[in-house]
Amino acid sequence: MTDKHSLRRRGYVLLLLGLLFLLPGCREKPAAKAPGGYDVVDDRGRTIHFDAKPQRVYGNTLSLEEVLLDLLPPERIAAVSPPTLDPEYSLAADKAARVAGRVPAYPGPEPIAALQPDLIFAQLRARPETIATLEEMGFKVFCMEVPTNLDMVRKRLRQMSEAVGEPERGQALLAELDEKVAYVKSRTADIPPEKRRVLLGFSSMGAFGHPDGLFHDICRQSGVINGAARIHMAYGSHLSDEQILQIDPDIMMFVDDGAANDYGGQIRDRVLGDPALQTAKAVKNRRFFFLKDRYRASNTQHMGDAILQIARNVYPDAFTESGTAK
């Protein structure tokens, strides 16, 4: 009997303790988020909170650094890398020179952590172990898809400007980009289908332009037909002479890598001098132009400049006062 009463009393005690635990103020409260600030969501769906605008921002690729250099003053950028300082490859080399910090190209987590950034922009193609290590160390990493078309570039500009707390500046960059795209369209929209020219681009690695890549959309926005997409060129593949003849481009584009490839001259000489390509229309007519490498895959606010460069070279007559392509 005593045991029964004892067990019953213990049960009452445990029940009371449980009720007390549930009452407000009787258990530890989770830490409350600081009032104010703002939240942003990256392309992984992860929410990042900022109590104030980040002051030491780092982007881990040339293209991310180029965006930051037009969004922020140099003192809010933690560091830039050698490619961003090189005018052969960078469209923001002059602004990059005003940033105090330096970091190697494609750094691991240690050099990035040494910068003590309060926001890191990274592309989803970046090494996942680097991103994971930085996040484990407590750094805020905003991950984004690599843009492969104009809409994705627009999205990137909006995301980055919102993350750094400068949405108005982002809107200004978008307006500049859209103005250039609209200008090209106004000059090329009336070119009939039969006068649309087929362009084939060549880098030091050979012909390029697979249909899912950014260059394809740059061509499309320029009113130009991307020759490589005509035969559904796969990413990372190379075109044979037979495939180039099958495309039979109206005009060829040679990437200017600076002094390393004689400013595109080495590619030109190799392609135009290939005996197997002498019947190709562009080779016979010597129709070609050079494009700086920094424009070829410009997935930043400078995409509008790349579109304009290609359109002007392919349809020079459309950009005269009469504005009629021949």
Predicted regions and their residues:
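Short helices/loops that flank or line small-molecule/ion binding pockets
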Residues: 107-116, 137, 238-248
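Short helix-initiation/N-cap motifs at beta->coil->alpha
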Residues: 43-45, 99-110, 147, 232-241
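A short, structured surface patch at a secondary-structure boundary
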Residues: 58-115, 119-124, 227
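Bacterial lipoprotein signal-peptidase II cleavage site
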Residues: 26-35
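Bacterial N-terminal signal peptides
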Residues: 13-22
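Extracytoplasmic substrate-binding proteins
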Residues: 26, 47, 129-207, 228-229, ...
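Bacterial N-terminal signal peptides that target proteins for export
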Residues: 2-13
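Alpha-helical, coiled-coil/dimerization segments enriched in small aliphatic residues
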Residues: 86, 208-236
